[in-house]
Amino acid sequence: MQVNNLGFIASILFVLVPTVFLLILFIQTRQETEG
């Protein structure tokens, strides 16, 4: 089965971008509550 390279990259970005965004929000809120 041949995988479309552009679709593969798009799917990775579609998963990575929200994950990184949530991680940044999570870290910022943790730092605010700690200090």
Curated annotation (Swiss-Prot):
Membrane topology category: Single-pass membrane protein
An example GO biological process term is:
photosynthesis, light reaction
* One Pfam family of this chain: PsbM
Q: What is its main location?
A: membrane
Q: Where are the transmembrane segments?
A: 7-27
Q: Does the keyword Transmembrane helix apply?
A: yes
Which named protein is this? Photosystem II reaction center protein M
Organism equals: Microcystis aeruginosa (strain NIES-843 / IAM M-2473)
